[in-house]
Amino acid sequence: MTTILKSLPKGENVGIAFSGGLDTSAALLWMKQKGAKVFAYTANLGQPDEADYDAIPRKAMEFGAEKARLVDCRTQLVHEGIAAIQAGAFHVSTGGIAYFNTTPLGRAVTGTMLVSAMKEDGVNIWGDGSTYKGNDIERFYRYGLLTNPALRIYKPWLDQQFIDELGGRAEMSAFMTSHGFAYKMSAEKAYSTDSNLLGATHEAKDLEHLDSGIKIVNPIMGVPFWRDDCAVKAEAVTVRFEEGQPVALNGQTFTDPVAMFYEANAIGGRHGLGMSDQIENRIIEAKSRGIYEAPGMALLHIAYERLVTGIHNEDTIEQYRINGMKLGRLLYQGRWFDSQALMLRETAQRWVARAVTGEVTLELRRGNDYSILNTVSPNLTYAPERLSMEKVEDAPFTPADRIGQLTMRNLDITDTRAKLGLYAKTGLLSSGEGTPIPQLENDKG
């Protein structure tokens, strides 16, 4: 039996992820009038552009919902965001600046917590506003069915009758007005925005064109640092971790991780930290482009990685990065709770994050311009005396030790030279001036 419904299931309980915007408002009213029993669920994800969460369920009831619930998802969202930082679960980057997977993290939390709330109310049909071209339709599908295997999916935007009757925002606005709801369309922006406490995504419309960029975006979590009239003062900030958990900012200890994240966003946002312009591959392998904000995630990530590099050895750091790239892609694909993702995540949290205790002091300037001023940890394996250019007592190794170590390298150098000669003989490589490798003499003995 298919889990996707192509038409409205009249007379049945249907849950809708309700934002209070024009699209979901029109969809709720339309489904009600067509005979469905509509239940509205709103996720409080700490969206920085949402002024009054409590008003959203009231609005849903006015439009005919049988029941409307506001589900506070912020604590779980921050929990997942910190887990992503601990595991370095970020696979999309440009020039070393990462996209912090804030939308995929939000979908993992929304998709599980809203469907759990629906299940409590006896609602086993779920609708949301994701379109067939995007990532969210698959993310919500996976998380919804993981949470409730009896779930069926109904999306008004995949229902041809809904599309024929309310195919655009102008039609939706007219529909709401004709039924006594003076719903005016908001002014059209040059792009669309989706946000949560961890970050904001700006995409589509004008941002689909690569000759439009960050300068057309009005940040909602930070400042337009690229503008000459935007005053940004340098600021020192200290971040403290205990066993991989961020616990203090500028000496202020937080017992509530949500409050800590609000403060991290405020600090990073004052500088525009964490904004990036990325071209990425969607789940369906088509490329899309987005402008991202994540001031708090960026601040914590920078401090965390500084401690990681000062505490762990090279092989551990290498594996952390490899696993993080893989885990980031799984997260992006809506597989954050799949077994392979849990394995990678648990590995990082247990063997990398647990050792990360200490403080990092940064100087934030404009955008992603910052300096690291100090790093302190009881677990640092960085020991400057090991490599000091000055004479030190009880040196860990001597010139004679290094001579012996270099002599041992002759074994693999000889093997490598022989291989290069073999490749040159077979035509795989050319040697000599102007080629990738210099003229090498054959090993004569």
Swiss-Prot record:
- A single GO molecular function, which one? ATP binding
Where is the protein situated, by its record's location annotation? Cytoplasm
Main subcellular localization, coarse class?
cytoplasm
* Residues binding L-aspartate, per UniProt: T131, N135, D136
Q: In which pathway does it act?
A: Amino-acid biosynthesis; L-arginine biosynthesis; L-arginine from L-ornithine and carbamoyl phosphate: step 2/3
Q: Which InterPro entries match?
A: Arg_succ_synth_type2_subfam, Arginosuc_syn_C, Arginosuc_syn_N, Arginosuc_synth, Arginosuc_synth_CS, Arginosuc_synth_type_1_subfam, AS_cat/multimer_dom_body, AS_multimer_C_tail
Please verify whether the record's keywords include rRNA-binding.
no
Q: Which UniProt keywords apply?
A: Amino-acid biosynthesis, Arginine biosynthesis, ATP-binding, Cytoplasm, Ligase, Nucleotide-binding
Record: residues binding ATP: A17, F18, S19, G20, G21, L22, D23, T24, S25, A43, G129, T131, D136, D194
- Binding of L-citrulline occurs at Y99, N135, R139, S192, T201, E203, E280
Per the UniProt entry, the Enzyme Commission number(s) are 6.3.4.5
* Pfam families recorded: Arginosuc_syn_C (PF20979), Arginosuc_synth (PF00764)
* Any single biological process term in GO: urea cycle
Swiss-Prot/TrEMBL catalytic activity: L-citrulline + L-aspartate + ATP = 2-(N(omega)-L-arginino)succinate + AMP + diphosphate + H(+)
Record-level GO cellular component terms? cytoplasm
Q: How does it assemble?
A: Homotetramer.
The identity of this protein, by name, is Argininosuccinate synthase
This chain's source organism reads Rhodopseudomonas palustris (strain TIE-1)
Q: What is the lineage of its organism?
A: Bacteria, Pseudomonadati, Pseudomonadota, Alphaproteobacteria, Hyphomicrobiales
